[in-house]
């Protein structure tokens, strides 16, 4: 039987029920290698990142570029050759996986009082902000350089633009602060924005809503999206209905 823990904290063991408790998480293991997770709370972004590693162990690649990910304990290393990625500028961040907020932290945080007083760091004291920041549905494994370059830029269409990252068709207009993501990520992006809009009232402009509606239709839910959604539900306890409804159609 394979054990798993997020933090090295004292273990409570119940041999009869086969239950292992770490921190505030309870993990149930069965002999058929299927594991069931019951979530009490995810307290912060750090914990969410550690959990996300477990969720994405079998991901088909990095979110935007589709690079193979080599996981080493708490670190993810992208195989840049596997997707033809070309480093634009930041080699250090290009050689590691970071956890990208599809809906950026700035978008759901900048209007808060804590953000106005001290930015994202100050909002670490705000429980509601921390809850949104650590929502697993909004976190994706991305090449660090892409995560940094995307920053808090909004998604959009960039006509006559050239990709800056080799065969990874990610386009960023740094002056206009607009990102055109590769097609492989557009459907998931749209469904994440719709989820965040519904759950946390994240504002969508009419232009964004129309664009995401098109992306949602053109790029349907993938098998991996369904697998990921199920894993997140088992841990976090809620569905992204914009994914879930397509996974179990009768």
Swiss-Prot record:
One of its GO terms (molecular function) is deoxyribonuclease I activity. InterPro entries: Endonuclease-I, His-Me_finger_sf. The keyword Transferase does not apply. Transmembrane segments: none annotated. It comes from the Bacteria. Pfam families: Endonuclease_1. It catalyses: Endonucleolytic cleavage to 5'-phosphodinucleotide and 5'-phosphooligonucleotide end-products. It is an enzyme of class 3 (hydrolase). Coiled coil: none annotated. Its EC number is 3.1.21.1. Has double-strand break activity. Belongs to the EndA/NucM nuclease family. This is Endonuclease-1. The gene is endA.
